[in-house]
């Protein structure tokens, strides 16, 4: 009964647990618990190798403990049982059972099998977490873990494990992994330690990587599996499997043994289940296997499948996905509104609905369609009274069959019928709006109304729904309202319907336009829709277009009785006149090289200021012959009379002169870019009172009334009167009767234009003379001018006289905007748009279209002109509307415009020049285009004087008067001396005669400076050039060469680099210059290199003999009797192969034996056994690995044995107890010394005492006792072996007696060494125990082998480090070669003295080496001697001759008596003597000589060190001074750059503030805003901070020089600061809302602070004087140091300056950023100012409310607080105003600092440039042959 209750409780627990777990899955992802996948799957677990599976097998373990059993038996034929079969080691033993004695069972493989696999097969897909393997044996040397996801069809490797990954798994990375799925080899779990219970751990996911998506395909591939396989590939052994000298089999100790294998995981449910059940068909032993992990998920979240990998049926409204935090949108139920029970998922619908629904219902009922059966089928629609779930909710459609489509199809939702295209209505029973004619036969149902919607009234239906007739808008007509009335357009082209044409009244021919596009019909050359724009190349003429310049008018006779008739002046050079007809600009004249066809110039005398031009006496003569006189460029010119000029003169026309003195005078006015032009044409005509002008008008465009306008400029304040008379020349015009009466109007002094009140009628086609006489009105001022400046005459059409032109409204606008008054003014004022439009229309009307631009093809940039006015774009100095004339004082109209005359005022009579040639009018004796030079033969412009050249030259320099092109071989400023190569006296008339040195000067063979006459003989003699000699300088001096027979030959200095005697005439070839007698051991055609056998710098006379070691030098380069041939530059000797060093005196790495017959020999070190290829350079011994030896490491080393080609093993012999080489090279048996025994020769042999390693023999009797005891022991052992068995043995008295006797004998024997014998007994007992428990075939593993290997590795690393240390020790400080040249010369003589000693030492070394080799051979032979070979050794010793040995050692045979033996002997107490040549005396002499040499070299080294220290001290001092100078320069440059930027920014800020504050229109509110912006800048507030700032400034200024030039600038800046202070005071006076008392006080304090700054600056200037003196003292020292520095100093300095410039640019950029920050702060301050204003306004309102109302106490308190805040704010503003003054001070100081820094930088730049020039000059000199 109790058992039944327990079983029931267990069932309830099992049922309740899943329910609780499933509740956790609601709304969240859930996962089954992890477990051991091995549990319950013993049948699915297999191993490829198991020990004792078919028969019992023996195996052993490794152990070193005594009395420990080492070998056991494995019998796995039956399962494991604690009592009956504990030796079973099947694979199921590794499944964890948590039993107390779980270490008593394990799985074990067969012995010596390397490749073994363990495989776990799962029944479904599982999720894998990690694997843990716990080994009983060593862990495998290499293994790998694989997984399968397809039940074993394919496998993938999880991870590799190996002790040596590179050898076990080549090509596999050893990590670390770069990504979570990287395949790497892990070496952490494959070592020899621990020997048992070692673990191998594999995690499916590396925890070092972050996992963002656990359902990523890569992650899923790592954690899911159906099969797991562990492959062991190689056993871990201790190396004894390779040994062959033992008898036992080592394989029995090596196998795989596992205590347990844990595979942690869970059933894979994709996050949709927390419980799993057994898979169908699997064992149902859930209750018998607790902890088993099953493979089928109990799915939640509406999922299904073994792994919950899909949705349940009818749950497809949301897609399946792995479990997440919120799983409400996974596998949702489909919504088919009860019309279907089947659905499927469509991704397209899911995406289209934005992830809301993806389920599509299948097989909808009740006339339903749609993804959710939510729609009615065709010809049905949803009944609005029923729900969607109602099976009767879809009802049939009710549509008009004539107006609907598809037999009455309707909308399935609202029942709306589907109408034809032009039908509407719920039942499709009427036409749409805009359509008419409902018809069954019409496919569209109704016809479209064809009305133009722009021309139709948009009210309701645009046409009748039955007839289709349209209803038109205004100005539209037609059956479809698609046409505009005449005078309108735009229907269909604009959005406004029919709009007026609005054609231009002047530009269009009529008011009507095209009804399509509104284009008006234009007059010629007019374009645009309204015809109001001129075509390209045309323009609209303004009102004042018809202008007649006064300069082109003819003079009228003087009418005043007080003024005489003006003198008759003939026409000057023609000025272009306006043409008589359009086009108004004439074509450009072709340029001509001469301005006149024929002229004769008569040069007059210089004219006074107001000259009266008089004709010459020959006037009558020229006039009779057809010539006339004219003034051109200030000269009276006779020109050929032309017919037109004659006709004009007959007509009484004359021109106006340029010269003063006449009633009329032309005044040209030059135009400037910065001057407004208030005149037209070239200038004015200055008209005297009573004089007049005649204007010829011949280009009237149309018969109209015109206003006469006169433009002028008065010279006084008096008004003038103009009398106008118009004379018609031509036929009369009835429309314009000729009125020749005089008309008068006033020219007021205050104006610039005057208009005749009444217009005059002028007809086109006629020519008119408009005569105007100017009279000055009476004036009270007697000194007022009687002249007036007349500019031009203008004709302005009267708008009212233009027939049928414009309406009264246009005329009213014309008058309202004063269009005529504005058009009359000169200067190109911009007219109002209304005036410009009306005038343009009138111009097009009058001229029948637009007027052609006619821009001059040379003077204008193009053919286009301005649309209104027609002004062309002129080139420089070109004027006129058409750009056809040169401006005054210019000439030569050409492609680049006109050129300025630039007449020299001191050489010309006027500023005018010929407009064609540009020739100015020159004074006497002056010529040139600009009258700027003297005539040839004269100089000294403008006071030209005749050249003084002693009649030997015709011209001279026009400025200095130096004569040019002197004749007759004369020279000099005044041709006062002879040329070089000539002798004479040109001043006294003595001609220049040639000198022959040896030929004439200029012949190429003149080799003298000059020649002179002998004062006695008068014969000329030569003064030879350097290098020439002889009476005629026709040969070269000694040390010079040259072939003087060739043209251009010269004697040049022989370039032999100072290596010849310059006094030796044969030192170089006199013709070729080749050096023949080189000195100082040099050779070559220029003595430029050292002789063979010498090296050094031949240019510095420093060629030294080569000192090559002949042993290591190439024999072909070392001839007998002469030094070896080394490199002539470096002294490097030509070494034999394998030899190195400058003198070829040492072997190269990899070579040895310098004393060999052929130099150094290769080491030939064994590549496999040597540590490197380098050997000892004397002995040739290679550096071997620890286990190898021999000279080239081709033998096993000491204490090692074996085949060196395969492996050398450690003998482990005790070196103190062995003889060389410690053990047998083939068997490894230790070779013990006599008296030593043991397998390792580490103990004394029997019969010897125990004092190891001495092991002295015992007494002779000891051998007898030892033999007796040994025999007895053998008998006792024999007796024991004869016993049947130990159990049946019974002690007998006889045997017991014998045993006792044996013990007594042993005690007797041990009386001498009892302790030692006891140890031997213990050792014997241990040996017996080991013999009993150890297999006879076992190999004893010595653990010291591993320790020795580690020691060898440490030794190898130490040798490498030692080698690196030696190489670095060889590197010494590099000393400048030039610095030690002098010291090296001293070494040279010491070296010569030591060379002989060195050779003696080398000879002694050879003898020593031979002696050492002899000793080594003897030692080696002695070591090889064995006890059994002593007779051989004795024979060899007897064969030795003492006399011979004595002779080799001491120098003489030792057979003589000691008194007679001069060299002594072995028995004489001495060896060697003065003349003895034995090895010992030679060695002693060599040692003494070596000691002396070492002392001398040590002394020399000391001297070298002292010299090197002095050089270093000098270099350090130089570097220190240089660094100090550079630091000062850097500091100056940085400071200058910083303040230069601050100065620029500060100046810009001050200018902006000054400009703003000086504006009188600035309001006080704006000033306050500006003050707030400035006050927002945080500056030092307290006087102490300001003082600290000034002290910092003084410290900076103390390191800067040259203040004097800046003090004046500082005073100016102080004045500016004072002005700024006054301006600030004005600002404060204007700021009424701010209390200014504190600000005024702050300003006064600022003034005092200014004075203090001045005092501080004076003190700084005094300090500067002291610094300047120190700098002056330092400059010579710096200069000397710079001279001794390398030539790269200049380049370094320039690079540093360039770096400073770059830093300056960086500081400038930072300054700009600071300025931007300041601007941002300023804007912020402005915003703050606005907030302050708003606060003040609110405050005023609050005050007003408080006075008008009775408020509560709380409101009053609030008002009080606000008042206090406002007062505090006002005080804050006052404080900020004080900070403004501080800012001004800082700005001034910054400006001063910037200027000072700039000057310092300029001085440093100049110093650098000078230094660079100096260095370049030095380099150029050094590059020459001689300095």
Swiss-Prot record:
Disruption phenotype: Significant defects in apical-basal distribution of Muller glia cell bodies in the retina. One of its GO terms (cellular component) is laminin complex. Residues 1477-1827 are annotated as: Domain I. Keywords: Basement membrane, Cell adhesion, Coiled coil, Disulfide bond, Extracellular matrix, Glycoprotein, Laminin EGF-like domain, Repeat, Secreted, Signal. Disulfide bonds join 267-276, 269-297, 299-308, 311-331, 334-343, 336-361, 364-373, 376-394, 397-410, 399-417, 419-428, 431-446, 449-463, 451-470, 472-481, 484-498, 501-513, 503-520, 522-531, 853-865, 855-872, 874-883, 886-898, 901-913, 903-920, 922-931, 934-944, 947-956, 949-963, 966-975, 978-992, 995-1011, 997-1022, 1024-1033, 1036-1051, 1054-1068, 1056-1075, 1078-1087, 1090-1103, 1106-1126, 1108-1133, 1135-1144, 1147-1160, 1163-1175, 1165-1182, 1184-1193, 1196-1208, 1211-1223, 1213-1230, 1232-1241, 1244-1255. Glycans are attached at residues 231, 1001, 1329, 1485, 1496, 1513, 1533, 1599, 1629, 1644, 1672, 1686, 1702, 1726, 1745, 1750, 1761. Residues 26-266 form the Laminin N-terminal domain. It is found in: Secreted, Extracellular space, Extracellular matrix, Basement membrane. InterPro entries: EGF-like_dom (IPR000742), LAMB1-4_helical (IPR056558), LAMB4_dom (IPR056860), Laminin/Netrin_ECM (IPR050440), Laminin_IV_B (IPR013015), Laminin_N (IPR008211), LE_dom (IPR002049), LMN_ATRN_NET-like_EGF (IPR056863). Residues 267-333, 334-396, 397-448, 449-500, 501-544, 853-900, 901-946, 947-994, 995-1053, 1054-1105, 1106-1162, 1163-1210, 1211-1257 form the Laminin EGF-like domain. Transmembrane segments: none annotated. Residues 1450-1476 are annotated as: Domain alpha. Residues 540-847 form the Laminin IV type B domain. The alpha-helical domains I and II are thought to interact with other laminin chains to form a coiled coil structure. Laminin is a complex glycoprotein, consisting of three different polypeptide chains (alpha, beta, gamma), which are bound to each other by disulfide bonds into a cross-shaped molecule comprising one long and three short arms with globules at each end. Binding to cells via a high affinity receptor, laminin is thought to mediate the attachment, migration and organization of cells into tissues during embryonic development by interacting with other extracellular matrix components. Positively regulates apical-basal distribution of Muller glia cells in the retina. This is Laminin subunit beta-4. The lineage of its organism: Eukaryota, Metazoa, Chordata, Craniata, Vertebrata. The gene is lamb4.
């Amino acid at each position: 009964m109790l058992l039944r209750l327990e079983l029931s409780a267990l069932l309830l627990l099992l049922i309740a647990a899943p329910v609780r777990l499933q509740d956790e899955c609601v709304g969240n992802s859930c996962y089954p618990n992890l477990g051991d996948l091995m549990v319950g799957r013993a049948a699915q677990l297999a191993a490829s190798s198991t020990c004792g599976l078919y028969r019992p097998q023996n195996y052993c373990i490794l152990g070193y403990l005594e009395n420990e059993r080492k070998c056991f038996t494995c019998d796995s034929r039956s399962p494991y049982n604690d009592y009956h079969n504990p030796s079973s080691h099947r694979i199921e033993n590794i499944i964890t059972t948590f039993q107390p004695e779980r270490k008593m069972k394990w799985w074990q493989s067969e012995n010596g099998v390397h490749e073994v696999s363990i495989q776990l097969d799962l029944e479904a897909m599982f999720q894998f977490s990690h694997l843990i393997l716990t080994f009983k044996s060593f862990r495998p040397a290499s293994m790998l873990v694989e997984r399968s996801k397809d039940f074993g069809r394919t496998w993938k490797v999880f991870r590799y494990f190996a002790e040596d990954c590179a050898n076990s798994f080549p090509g596999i990375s050893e990590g670390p992994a770069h990504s979570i799925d990287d395949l790497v080899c892990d070496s952490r779990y494959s070592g020899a330690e621990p020997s048992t219970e070692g673990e191998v751990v594999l995690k499916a996911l590396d925890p070092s990587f972050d996992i963002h998506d656990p359902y990523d395909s890569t992650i899923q591939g790592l954690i899911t599996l159906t099969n797991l396989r562990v492959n062991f590939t190689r056993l871990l052994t201790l190396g004894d499997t390779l040994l062959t000298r033992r008898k036992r089999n080592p394989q029995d100790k090596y196998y795989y043994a596992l205590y347990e294998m844990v595979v942690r995981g869970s059933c894979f449910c994709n996050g949709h289940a927390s419980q799993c059940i057994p898979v169908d068909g699997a064992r149902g032993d859930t209750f018998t296997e607790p902890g088993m992990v099953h493979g089928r998920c109990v799915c939640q979240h509406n999922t299904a499948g073994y792994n919950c990998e899909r949705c349940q049926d009818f749950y497809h409204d949301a897609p399946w996905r792995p479990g997440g935090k919120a799983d409400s949108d996974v596998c949702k139920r489909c919504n088919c509104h009860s019309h279907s029970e089947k659905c499927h998922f469509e991704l397209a619908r899911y995406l289209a609905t934005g992830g809301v629904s993806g389920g599509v219902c299948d097989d909808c009922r009740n006339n339903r369609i749609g993804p959710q059966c939510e729609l009615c089928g065709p010809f049905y629609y949803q009944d609005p009274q029923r729900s969607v779930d109602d099976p009767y909710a879809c009802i049939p459609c009710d549509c008009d069959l004539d107006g609907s489509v598809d037999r009455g199809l309707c909308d399935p939702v609202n029942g709306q019928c589907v109408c034809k295209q032009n039908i509407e209505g719920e039942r499709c029973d009427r036409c749409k709006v805009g359509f008419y004619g409902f018809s069954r036969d019409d496919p569209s149902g109704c016809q479209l109304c064809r009305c133009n919607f722009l021309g139709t009234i948009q009210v309701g239906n645009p046409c009748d729904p039955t007839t289709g007739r349209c209803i038109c808008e205004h100005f539209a007509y037609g059956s479809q309202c698609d046409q505009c009335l005449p005078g309108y357009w735009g229907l269909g082209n604009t959005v406004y319907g029919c709009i007026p044409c609005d054609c231009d009244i002047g530009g269009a021919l009529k008011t009507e336009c095209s009804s399509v596009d509104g284009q008006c019909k234009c007059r010629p050359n007019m374009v645009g829709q309204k015809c109001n724009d001129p075509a390209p190349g045309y323009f609209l003429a303004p009102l004042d277009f018809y202008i007649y310049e006064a300069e082109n008018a003819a003079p009228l006779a003087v009418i005043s009785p007080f003024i005489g008739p003006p003198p008759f002046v003939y026409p000057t050079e023609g000025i272009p006149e306006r043409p008589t007809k359009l086009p108004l600009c004439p074509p450009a004249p072709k340029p001509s090289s001469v301005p006149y066809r024929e002229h004769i110039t008569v040069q007059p005398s210089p004219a006074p200021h107001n000259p009266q031009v008089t004709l010459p006496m020959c006037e009558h003569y020229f006039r009779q012959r057809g010539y006339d006189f004219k003034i051109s460029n200030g000269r009276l010119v006779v020109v050929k009379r032309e017919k037109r000029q004659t006709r004009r003169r007959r007509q009484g026309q004359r021109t106006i002169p340029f010269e003063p003195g006449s009633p009329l005078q032309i005044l040209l006015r030059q135009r400037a870019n910065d001057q407004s032009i208030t005149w037209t044409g070239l200038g004015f005509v200055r008209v005297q009172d009573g004089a007049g002008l005649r204007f010829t008008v011949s280009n009237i465009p149309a018969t109209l009334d015109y206003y006469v306008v006169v433009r002028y400029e008065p010279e006084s304040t008096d008004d003038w009167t103009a009398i106008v008379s118009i004379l018609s020349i031509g036929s009369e015009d009835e429309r314009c009767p000729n009125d020749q009466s005089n008309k008068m109007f006033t020219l007021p002094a205050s104006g610039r234009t005057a208009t005749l009140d009444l217009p005059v009628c002028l007809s086109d086609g006629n020519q008119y003379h408009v005569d105007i006489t100017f009279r000055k009105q009476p004036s009270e001022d007697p000194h007022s001018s009687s002249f007036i400046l007349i500019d031009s005459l203008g004709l302005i059409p009267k708008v009212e006289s233009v027939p049928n032109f414009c309406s009264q409204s246009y005329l009213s606008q014309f008058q309202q905007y004063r269009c005529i008054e504005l058009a009359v003014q000169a200067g190109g004022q911009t007219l109002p748009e209304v005036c410009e439009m009306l005038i343009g229309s009138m111009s097009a009307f009058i001229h029948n279209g637009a007027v052609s631009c006619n821009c001059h093809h040379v003077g204008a940039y193009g053919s286009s002109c301005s649309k209104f006015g027609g002004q062309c774009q002129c080139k420089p100095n070109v004027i006129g509307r058409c750009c056809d004339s040169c401006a005054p004082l210019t000439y030569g109209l050409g492609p680049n415009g006109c050129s300025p005359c630039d007449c020299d005022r001191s050489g010309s009579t006027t500023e005018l020049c010929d407009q064609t040639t540009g020739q100015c009018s020159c004074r006497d004796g002056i010529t040139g285009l600009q009258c700027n030079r003297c005539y040839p033969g004269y100089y000294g412009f403008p006071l030209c004087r005749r050249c003084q050249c002693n009649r030997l030259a015709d011209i001279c320099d026009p400025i200095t008067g130096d004569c040019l092109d002197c004749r007759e071989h004369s020279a000099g400023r005044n041709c006062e001396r002879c040329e070089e190569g000539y002798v004479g006296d040109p001043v006294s008339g003595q001609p220049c005669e040639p000198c022959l040195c040896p030929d004439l000067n200029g012949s190429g063979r003149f080799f003298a400076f000059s020649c002179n006459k002998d004062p006695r003989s008068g014969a000329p003699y030569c003064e030879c050039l350097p290098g020439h000699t002889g009476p005629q300088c026709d040969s070269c001096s000694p040390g010079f060469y040259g072939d003087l027979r060739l043209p251009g030959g010269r004697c040049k200095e022989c370039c032999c680099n100072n290596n010849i005697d310059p006094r030796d005439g044969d030192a170089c070839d006199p013709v070729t210059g080749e050096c023949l007698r080189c000195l100082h051991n040099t050779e070559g055609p220029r003595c430029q290199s050292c002789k063979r056998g010498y090296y050094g710098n031949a240019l510095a006379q420093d060629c030294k003999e080569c000192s090559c070691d002949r042993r290591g030098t190439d024999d072909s380069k070392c001839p007998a009797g002469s030094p070896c041939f080394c490199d002539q530059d470096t002294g490097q000797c030509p070494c034999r192969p394998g030899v190195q060093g400058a003198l070829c005196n040492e072997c190269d790495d990899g070579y040895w034996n310098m004393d060999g017959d052929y130099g150094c020999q290769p080491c030939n070190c064994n590549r496999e056994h040597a540590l490197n290829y380098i050997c000892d350079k004397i002995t040739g011994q290679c550096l071997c690995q620890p286990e190898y030896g021999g000279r080239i490491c081709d033998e096993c080393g000491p204490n090692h044995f074996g085949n060196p080609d395969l492996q050398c093993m450690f003998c482990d012999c005790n070196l103190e107890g062995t003889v060389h080489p410690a053990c047998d090279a083939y068997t490894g048996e230790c070779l013990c010394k006599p008296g030593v025994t043991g397998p390792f020769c580490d103990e004394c042999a029997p019969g010897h005492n125990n004092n190891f390693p001495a092991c002295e023999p015992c007494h002779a009797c000891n051998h007898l006792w030892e033999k007796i005891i040994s025999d007895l022991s053998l008998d006792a052992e024999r007796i024991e072996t004869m016993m049947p068995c130990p159990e049946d043995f019974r002690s007998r008295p006889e045997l017991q007696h014998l045993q006792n006797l044996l013990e007594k004998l042993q005690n007797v024997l041990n009386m001498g060494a009892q302790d030692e014998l006891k140890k031997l007994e213990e050792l014997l007992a241990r040996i017996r125990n080991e013999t009993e428990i150890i297999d006879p075939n076992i190999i004893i593993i010595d653990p010291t082998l591993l320790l020795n290997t580690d020691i060898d590795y440490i030794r190898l690393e130490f040798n490498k480090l030692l080698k690196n240390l030696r190489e670095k020790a060889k590197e010494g400080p590099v000393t400048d070669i030039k610095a030690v040249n002098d010291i090296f010369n001293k070494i040279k003589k010491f070296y010569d003295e030591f060379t002989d000693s060195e050779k003696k030492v080398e000879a002694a070394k050879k003898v020593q080496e031979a002696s050492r080799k002899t000793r080594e051979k003897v030692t080696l032979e002695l070591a090889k001697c064995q006890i059994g070979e002593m007779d051989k050794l004795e024979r060899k010793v007897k064969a030795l001759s003492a006399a011979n040995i004595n002779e080799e050692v001491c120098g003489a045979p030792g057979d003589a008596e000691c008194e007679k033996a001069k060299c002594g002997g072995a028995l004489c107490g001495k060896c060697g003597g003065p003349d003895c040549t034995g090895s010992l005396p030679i060695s002693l002499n060599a040692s003494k000589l070596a000691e002396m040499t070492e002392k001398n070299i040590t002394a020399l080294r000391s001297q070298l060190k002292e010299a090197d220290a002095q050089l270093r001290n000098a270099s350090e001092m130089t570097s220190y001074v240089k660094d100090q100078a550079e630091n000062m320069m850097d500091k100056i440059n940085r400071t200058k750059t910083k303040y230069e930027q601050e100065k620029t920014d500060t100046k810009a800020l001050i200018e902006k503030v000054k400009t703003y504050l000086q504006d009188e229109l600035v309001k006080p509110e704006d000033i306050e805003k500006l003050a707030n912006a400035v006050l927002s800048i945080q500056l030092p507030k307290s006087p102490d901070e300001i003082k600290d700032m000034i002290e910092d400034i003084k410290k900076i200024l103390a390191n800067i020089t040259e203040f004097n030039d800046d003090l004046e600038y500082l005073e100016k800046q102080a004045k500016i600061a004072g002005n700024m202070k006054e301006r600030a005071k004005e600002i404060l006076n204007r700021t009424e809302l701010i209390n200014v008392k504190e600000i005024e006080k702050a300003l006064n304090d600022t003034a005092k602070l200014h004075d203090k700054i001045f005092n501080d600056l004076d003190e700084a200037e005094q300090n500067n004087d002291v610094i300047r003196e120190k700098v002056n003292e330092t400059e010579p020292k710096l200069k000397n140091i710079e001279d001794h520095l390398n030539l790269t100093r200049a380049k370094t300095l320039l690079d540093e300056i360039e770096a400073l410039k770059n830093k300056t640019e960086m500081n400038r950029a930072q300054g700009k950023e600071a300025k931007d920050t300041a601007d941002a702060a300023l804007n912020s301050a402005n915003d703050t100012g606005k907030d302050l204003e708003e606060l003040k306004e609110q405050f005023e309102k609050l005050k007003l409310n408080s006075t008008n109302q009775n408020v509560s106490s709380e409101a009053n308190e609030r008002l009080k607080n606000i008042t206090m805040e406002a007062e505090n704010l006002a005080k804050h503003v006052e404080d900020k105003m004080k900070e403004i003054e501080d800012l001004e001070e800082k700005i001034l100081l910054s400006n001063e600092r910037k200027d000072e820094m700039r000057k310092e930088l300029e001085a440093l730049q100049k110093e650098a440039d000078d230094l660079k020039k100096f260095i370049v000059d030095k380099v150029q000199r050094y590059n020459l042959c001689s300095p």
